[in-house]
A protein has these predicted regions:
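Extracytoplasmic cell-surface/polysaccharide-interacting catalytic and binding patches
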Residues: 1-53, 147-150
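Catalytic cores and adjacent binding grooves of peptidoglycan-active enzymes
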Residues: 2, 80, 85, 93-152, ...
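Short connector loops at helix/strand junctions that flank enzyme active sites
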Residues: 55-57, 84-88
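Glycine-biased, low-complexity coil/linker segments
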Residues: 156-158
Length: 173
């Protein structure tokens, strides 16, 4: 592994966790981020992921982080995906209770842009998609708890519509 991939973005998260992709490896896609994307990933770690990890004291597995344009296209990501900017990550959640706990904690304690609890009932996959914009003032605090994605793998970004404010989401949970 080269030095760039070993780079710590925060105490518990490395660049390689954001860039590793079996699909990219299989297809020979170079999924290396640029400097701005690395800064955005660091911001996401500092603002949301690291505080979440510190609070629960357990490892968090990123299933999809940074995606170059070619990889995003292959996995069916949306054209303006925040994954391509280094602003988004999908997190594996072992069960719905953990998803609910993490979701509520993120809404109440972090400055995020978008938070979706996504799931595919046919494939029985569930994950949290979260993002944080580089410019903190532009974070929308869009949170949708029960966002169903039709038969999509956890590395695919949802195409959701609608939103609620952090306060509304807290009351809905």
């Amino acid at each position: 592994m080269n030095k760039q991939n070993d780079m710590q973005l925060s105490e518990h998260f490395t660049l390689s966790e954001f860039t590793k992709s079996i699909t990219a490896e299989r297809l020979g896609i170079d999924n290396k981020p640029g400097y701005e994307q690395m800064l955005a990933m660091r911001r996401l770690c500092q603002e949301v992921l690291e505080p979440l990890r510190q609070h629960y004291g357990k490892p968090i597995r990123i299933t999809s982080g940074y995606r170059c344009e070619a990889l995003n296209r292959v996995v069916g990501g949306v054209g303006r995906s925040q994954h391509m900017l280094g602003e988004a990550a999908d997190l594996s959640v072992p069960n719905e209770q953990v998803a609910r706990d993490w979701f509520q904690w993120i809404v109440r304690n972090t400055n995020f842009d978008q938070l979706l609890f996504e799931h595919s009932s046919r494939l029985r996959n569930r994950w949290l998609h979260l993002s944080c914009k580089w410019d903190r003032k532009r974070n929308r605090h869009q949170a949708i708890y029960n966002y169903k994605v039709s038969n999509s793998p956890p590395s695919r970004e949802g195409l959701g519509v609608g939103s609620c404010t952090a306060g509304t989401c807290k009351r809905q949970l």
